[in-house]
């Protein structure tokens, strides 16, 4: 199953929705708060070290970045959200662009919401969940950096988040570690359903 993701390659980067690829095929978004480990998760998912650039300055990347799996399937890396040092006018633009993106892209097939296991379900995460839920978009929450916590603490956070998302349909959660490759096979399996690789 990993071969689909290992062949991912950079497609394009755009500052606004006008530059997005044609609204067709299968598109799965990766979204998360700045510094949640989103770029590293994408690199781990694709078994590549430098596909998604890891910024040393959280909130720096304000472009939508698309990675192509094949001519019909794409990963969309959304700008990191919720970082305090981002100017207010950029936050406002981000909110407007994301609202339009979620409501206008008919090709959306799934979402991966990336959350630091030590700081899950912050207000911006909740907003992303609501957007996904409003358009009935299947969603996988990955609690990254699980290696930073002891096993019991990580497990407790997992069950706490699982309980809090019961009100949402089509949402699942898992622990994930880019360092130890924890949860990688489960994420591949979930993405296979998003991309139509399995019935």
UniProtKB/Swiss-Prot annotation:
It comes from the Bacteria. InterPro entries: G_ENGB_dom, GTP-bd, GTP-bd_ribosome_bio_YsxC, P-loop_NTPase. The gene is engB. The keyword Nucleotide-binding applies. Belongs to the TRAFAC class TrmE-Era-EngA-EngB-Septin-like GTPase superfamily. EngB GTPase family. Mg(2+) binds at residues 39, 61. Keywords: Cell cycle, Cell division, GTP-binding, Magnesium, Metal-binding, Nucleotide-binding, Septation. PANTHER family: ENGB-TYPE G DOMAIN-CONTAINING PROTEIN, MSS1/TRME-RELATED GTP-BINDING PROTEIN. Its cofactor is Mg(2+). The keyword Metal-binding applies. GO terms for cellular component: cytosol. GTP binds at residues 32-39, 59-63, 77-80, 144-147, 176-178. This is Probable GTP-binding protein EngB. One of its GO terms (biological process) is division septum assembly. Necessary for normal cell division and for the maintenance of normal septation. Residues 24-197 form the EngB-type G domain. One of its GO terms (molecular function) is GTP binding.
């Amino acid at each position: 199953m990993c071969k689909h993701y290992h062949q991912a390659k950079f497609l394009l980067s755009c500052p606004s929705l006008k530059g997005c690829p044609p609204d067709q095929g299968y598109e799965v978004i990766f979204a998360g708060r700045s510094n949640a480990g989103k770029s590293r998760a994408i690199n781990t998912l694709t078994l590549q070290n430098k596909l998604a650039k890891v910024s040393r300055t959280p909130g720096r990347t304000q472009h939508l970045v698309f990675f192509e799996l094949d001519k019909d399937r794409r990963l969309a890396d959304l700008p990191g959200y919720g970082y305090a040092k981002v100017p207010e006018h950029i936050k406002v633009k981000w909110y407007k662009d994301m609202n339009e993106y979620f409501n206008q892209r008919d090709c959306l097939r799934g979402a991966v919401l990336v959350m630091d296991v030590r700081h899950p379900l912050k207000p911006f995460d909740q907003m992303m969940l609501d957007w996904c839920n409003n358009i009935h978009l299947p969603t996988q929450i990955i609690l990254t950096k699980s290696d930073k916590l002891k096993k019991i603490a990580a497990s407790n956070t997992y069950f706490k988040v699982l309980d809090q998302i019961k009100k949402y349909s089509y949402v699942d959660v898992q622990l994930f570690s880019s360092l130890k490759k924890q949860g990688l096979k489960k994420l591949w399996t979930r993405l296979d359903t998003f991309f139509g690789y399995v019935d």
